[in-house]
Amino acid sequence: MLHPAIESAYRVLATGEPLTHGEALQLANLSGSDLLDLASLAHKVQLRYAGGVESFHACSIMNAKSGVCGENCRFCAQSKHNNAAIEVYDLVSDDSVLIEARQAVANGVSHFGIVTSGYGYQRITPEFERLLGMIDRLHSELPSLNVCASFGVLGEEPVAALAAHGIAHYNINLQVEPNRYNDLIATTHSAEERIATIHRLRQHNIAVCCGGIIGVGESVEERIGLLIALQALDLAVIPLNVLVPIAGTPLEKSEPLSAAEVLKTFAICRLLHPRTIIKFAAGRETMMKDFQGLLMLAGVNGFLTGGYLTTRGRDVADDQRFAAQLASFA
């Protein structure tokens, strides 16, 4: 017998209309075997409104500039305010990016993201000009590849330039419920600066990839608050990360979320965003371990493959086989 909150949530499957905030909070209190019923509903909603296996979204990223970031994000190994042991380097060469992008194409990945550490760019600097050149070269030499970017907070001029250079998606995460950003993530910039960047991107018709990170000390209600806040941003992709505690950061001793809590979060995200690509990013392999397959049957229709900015991921070939096996559940 279905839990009444899940039974009520089946209207999302029938109508395609998302949960209300109150309904999402009710589902957030579920536990035990009810979570499998919730996952089943989320999977059905994903298949009906966000496409089947053929629309599964896999992407790879490259850390093109690493470390020495002046922002004090509490979870991040690249912040100079933290003491994580990572490789530090300035912006890499165009050739280095091209090699990584070619490998992504060879692996059958359709989207490739260039990522840089740092606050962002309020104007077009010489470094930003180099990034634009990288984008142009990838378009020229790998025309089948969707080139994406994540360069931090952007002003009007850099956003307009990215639009002119044909960027496919721009990633900038909200991370947590906006009114908790300075408490849980960073004090050197605000959630409002990120939201302003998203609005600029959408004004220039750039598709936005924006999600967050769970397990950083937020309450269950605040976790739902993040998912609700994302509804107002007109997003193409929602990547959700599960905190991977990194030594040398303020969150290194954080208690990891249970697989059940992660499952519940992703399933509720699908019911709040029936038509959006929902991507499992960091934490899929390291935090979910044996349960990551279950997550992919709980409304998720995309993942990051081949590794993250400062942590390793699973082999792309293994992920391709994994994605193909999901077709059995469509």
From Swiss-Prot:
Amino-acid positions noted as binding [2Fe-2S] cluster in the UniProt annotation, renumbered to this chain: 148, 209, 279
Entry EC number(s): 2.8.1.6
CDD domains attached to this UniProt entry: Radical_SAM
Reactions accelerated catalytically: (4R,5S)-dethiobiotin + (sulfur carrier)-SH + 2 reduced [2Fe-2S]-[ferredoxin] + 2 S-adenosyl-L-methionine = (sulfur carrier)-H + biotin + 2 5'-deoxyadenosine + 2 L-methionine + 2 oxidized [2Fe-2S]-[ferredoxin]
Superkingdom, taxonomy of origin: Bacteria
Cofactor note: Binds 1 [4Fe-4S] cluster. The cluster is coordinated with 3 cysteines and an exchangeable S-adenosyl-L-methionine.
Domain Radical SAM core intervals: 51-284
Keyword Iron: yes
A GO MF label: iron ion binding
Cofactor(s) recorded in Swiss-Prot or TrEMBL: [4Fe-4S] cluster; [2Fe-2S] cluster
InterPro entries noted in UniProt: Aldolase_TIM, BATS_dom, Biotin_synth/BioAB, Biotin_synthase, Elp3/MiaA/NifB-like_rSAM, rSAM
UniProt record, GO biological process: biotin biosynthetic process
Residues binding [4Fe-4S] cluster, per UniProt: 69, 73, 76
Keywords of this entry: 2Fe-2S, 4Fe-4S, Biotin biosynthesis, Iron, Iron-sulfur, Metal-binding, S-adenosyl-L-methionine, Transferase
Pathway: Cofactor biosynthesis; biotin biosynthesis; biotin from 7,8-diaminononanoate: step 2/2
Pfam families, sorted: BATS (PF06968), Radical_SAM (PF04055)
Quaternary data: Homodimer.
Function (record text): Catalyzes the conversion of dethiobiotin (DTB) to biotin by the insertion of a sulfur atom into dethiobiotin via a radical-based mechanism.
PANTHER family: BIOTIN SYNTHASE, BIOTIN SYNTHASE, MITOCHONDRIAL
Listed HAMAP family: BioB
Homology family: Belongs to the radical SAM superfamily. Biotin synthase family.
Identification of the protein by name: Biotin synthase
Organism: Chlorobium chlorochromatii (strain CaD3)
